[in-house]
From Swiss-Prot:
Signal sequence range: none
Tissue and organ expression note: Expressed in floral and vegetative organs. Also barely detectable in leaves and stems.
Chief localisation class: nucleus
Short name of any one Pfam family annotated for the protein: TPR_2
GO cellular component assignments: nucleus
TPR repeats: 88-121, 124-157, 184-217
Coiled coil residues, start to end: 139-191
Keyword Transferase (UniProt): no
Name recorded for this polypeptide: Protein POLLENLESS 3-LIKE 1
Keywords for this protein: Cell cycle, Cell division, Coiled coil, Nucleus, Repeat, TPR repeat
Function: Probably involved in the regulation of cell division.
A GO biological process held by the record: cell division
Family: Belongs to the MS5 protein family.
């Protein structure tokens, strides 16, 4: 091994290079946990941690986790609470065991009875347990009241200084949440509760307040469900489309996928229901086309009516194979509406009546012109004057119904309204009967009156004769 010739030279020492094992670094590959050798102590150790000692709480935890005896664990937890040994932990663990046994009412009563013994820091976790018990037992109203109480205390309490620390017992770690995040969580839960209570307006307000504090796709999907319940499908559809566009095809892997699928199913069902209730909405375009074609057909019919009567006959023949709707559309006016029928001597207006002869059988016809006297109306008017007030109303209505243009009514028009003529004849007979009855009654009354007058006169004459004698 060579040494430097001059020991006093700078950087004295050996001139040989350092060995290779100093420069190369060894790389250790970590073995999987399943392939590692385990010591006998680790193999015999349980997967959970059990506290050591002989206190009531430790014995209760041992019965819960090791012995797997929930009933004995509940009795030991009661003993720990009465002894004052870790009251908050014993109470919460006992409520968890009661919840596993579906004894929800007992857990609720235990929390209400002993939560005052627990410190302030554990009240929030106790409230969460109480909410779970209320939900399991179906007491939704109590859930809403408790959430509103938590919301009020969160807004009023300034103890946290802007941040809230919530410890997870299972992992023994802490998650920091701001007051706004915790408030948004409570508002979302409160909105869901009101959604179950069918208070959709209140639920919408809580959801929108929660989304203003913290955006959340799960709350957006629940808000869409709330809007669907309120028959506001367009807003719900836009919300769901925004959620789907923001995530693309990755929404199936998100935790809110069930809410999104539920909202989509409800929206599809509601749209199908609206289509079933109003099928004409889907046929708007075809209906408009048919309407325009029918309107053009109606204009053609009007032009044909302006011609001769032979053209009208041809139109009526061409429409003989069509449905009643097409015939009505080609008619001069809609037969479902009352209209004026001016009876004049022109052939065109008379031909209009001939064209619509089959569709206007029971319509009332009247005119605005001057009132004319009926050919058969002289006796009828005399009878009307002699009839009392009981029959005058119906006869006046009939007289207005058969208007002043009845002089020009042809035999063809009389055939069209046989029911009206029959009613008129019945009314005439009734008026004659009433008139005859009233006249006979008047005659009887006058006869009786005359007899009474004669009888009184005879008595007066007799009395005067007796006095004179």
């Amino acid at each position: 091994m060579r040494r430097r010739e001059s020991r006093g030279a700078k950087g004295g020492g050996f001139l040989t290079p350092p060995p290779s094992w100093h420069t190369t670094r060894r790389v250790y590959i970590a073995m999987p946990i399943s392939e590692r050798k385990r010591s006998p102590l680790i193999e015999n150790q349980e997967s959970f941690r059990v506290r050591t000692g002989d206190s009531p709480y430790v014995r209760a935890k041992h019965a819960q986790l090791v012995s797997k005896d929930p009933n004995r664990a509940i009795s030991l937890f009661w003993a720990a609470i009465n002894a004052g040994d870790r009251v908050d932990s014993a109470l919460k663990d006992m409520v968890v065991v009661l919840k596993q046994l579906n004894r929800f009412d007992e857990g609720i009563e235990a929390i209400k009875s002993f939560r005052y013994l627990c410190p302030f820091e554990s009240q929030d976790s106790i409230d969460n347990l109480l909410l779970e018990l209320y939900m399991k037992s179906g007491r939704i109203t109590e859930v809403a009241e408790l959430l509103e109480h938590k919301l009020r205390t969160l807004e009023q309490d300034k103890h946290y200084g802007g941040r809230i620390k919530i410890a997870k017992r299972s992992h023994e770690e802490q998650n920091n949440k701001t007051i706004e995040q915790e408030k948004a969580r409570i508002l979302g839960n409160l909105a869901w509760v009101h959604l179950q209570l069918h208070n959709y307006g209140i639920a919408e307000q809580y959801y929108r307040n929660a989304l203003s504090l913290e955006p959340d796709n799960n709350k957006l999907c629940n808000l869409a469900i709330c809007l669907i319940r309120m028959e506001r499908t367009h807003e719900a559809k836009s919300l769901l489309e925004d959620v789907k566009q923001s995530l693309g095809n990755q929404w199936k892997n998100e935790p809110f996928c069930k809410s999104f699928e539920r909202a989509t199913e409800m929206l599809a069902e509601r749209e199908q229901a609206t289509v079933a209730d109003k099928p004409e909405d889907l046929l708007t375009s075809s209906f408009s086309d048919n309407f325009s074609s029918r309107c053009s057909g109606g204009m053609k019919g009007k032009k044909a009516l302006a011609g001769t009567s032979t053209e009208l006959g041809n139109i009526h023949k061409t429409n003989s194979h069509a449905s009643s709707e097409s015939v009505e559309q080609n008619s001069p006016g809609l037969t479902t509406q009352p209209r004026e029928c001016k009876w004049v001597d022109e052939e065109v207006d008379q031909s209009k009546w001939d064209a619509t002869i089959g569709a206007s059988r029971k319509l009332r016809f009247w005119t605005v012109g001057p009132v004319r006297s009926l050919r058969f109306g002289n006796d009828y008017q005399k009878n009307l004057k002699s009839v009392g007030t009981a029959a005058s109303t119906t006869n006046d209505e009939l007289h207005q119904f058969i208007s002043s243009d009845a002089d020009c009514m042809t035999s063809k028009a009389r055939k069209l309204c046989p029911e009206l003529i029959k009613d008129k004849e019945d009314n005439e007979k009734e008026s004659e009967r009433i008139a005859s009855e009233s006249s006979s009654a008047y005659a009887k009354i006058t006869d009786i009156g005359q007899r009474k007058v004669l009888h009184i006169d005879q008595r007066k004459v007799r009395h005067i004769g007796q006095r004179s004698v």
